[in-house]
Amino acid sequence: MTAPGLPLLRAPNLAVPHAFTTRAGGVSAGPYAGLNLDDRSDDPRPVAENRARLAAALGFAADDFARLNQVHGVQVVHAQAPGFWEGDALVTATPGVLLAIGTADCYPLLLADPEAGVIGAAHAGWKGTVGRIGQRTVEQMVNLGARPERIHAAVGPGICGEQYEVGEDVAAQFRAAGLGEWVLEREGRTHLDLAGANRALLEGAGVGDLWVSGRCSTEADFYSYRRDAGQTGRMWAVIGLPRREGQTGEARA
């Protein structure tokens, strides 16, 4: 396993190990070609290699990931060790755990309070955005000792508003949640600006420092569920606290 020159996107305001992946640098083939990190449809062998490459690029091992069966809900999981849970956000204060969120149009949110040693990661589709998954993640980070004004947050690549057409039923739920400012009307069609909505929600939660990638998942560099009619891979957004000197692997969940 090697990870030479693995192309990863980094947020300039996050001072802990982290990355937003693209589809470049991996070994998957076919519609998943590249750095696909989801093994539900792809051959699990190249996916395992892709995950190992990503972990190595950040100084972690392939079994350090804390992952989720994401269900477009608002459950925030406190991951005290690597493992696999159901939910749509993760928080931890445990060094050596690499939080991972999978996306292919939904927005990944990465958060860190380096002073407190607390990090978080969230999956924000339209349902999670309406449910304020970013704010809920901040709240759980505060429970672990973080302070909102010290949190640095990054909004990674996702489907841009110009490409994200939705039905009136979805737009109505956005408006009912107080997010009508991010419902866009384009030539008689309705779109959502998920990046703008999540940025505003994180600001409303008191987050002191925000960065937005501005990249759209429908670009060729990324996997996109909508662009590829569902037959596609997944990027991961990952964030971790480095192990302390002399620390070995934690017990597995």
Curated annotation (Swiss-Prot):
Zn(2+) binds at H72, C106, H123. Pfam families: Cu-oxidase_4. InterPro entries: Cu_polyphenol_OxRdtase, Cu_polyphenol_OxRdtase_sf, Cytotoxic_necrot_fac-like_cat. Its EC number is 2.4.2.1, 3.5.4.4, 2.4.2.28. Keywords: Copper, Hydrolase, Metal-binding, Oxidoreductase, Transferase, Zinc. Belongs to the purine nucleoside phosphorylase YfiH/LACC1 family. It comes from Deinococcus radiodurans (strain ATCC 13939 / DSM 20539 / JCM 16871 / CCUG 27074 / LMG 4051 / NBRC 15346 / NCIMB 9279 / VKM B-1422 / R1). The keyword Translocase does not apply. Its cofactor is Cu(2+); Zn(2+). This is Purine nucleoside phosphorylase DR_1966. It catalyses: adenosine + phosphate = alpha-D-ribose 1-phosphate + adenine; S-methyl-5'-thioadenosine + phosphate = 5-(methylsulfanyl)-alpha-D-ribose 1-phosphate + adenine; inosine + phosphate = alpha-D-ribose 1-phosphate + hypoxanthine; adenosine + H2O + H(+) = inosine + NH4(+). Purine nucleoside enzyme that catalyzes the phosphorolysis of adenosine and inosine nucleosides, yielding D-ribose 1-phosphate and the respective free bases, adenine and hypoxanthine. Also catalyzes the phosphorolysis of S-methyl-5'-thioadenosine into adenine and S-methyl-5-thio-alpha-D-ribose 1-phosphate. Also has adenosine deaminase activity. The lineage of its organism: Bacteria, Thermotogati, Deinococcota, Deinococci, Deinococcales. The keyword Transport does not apply. Homodimer. Gene3D superfamilies: CNF1/YfiH-like putative cysteine hydrolases (3.60.140.10). GO terms for molecular function: adenosine deaminase activity; copper ion binding; oxidoreductase activity; S-methyl-5-thioadenosine phosphorylase activity.
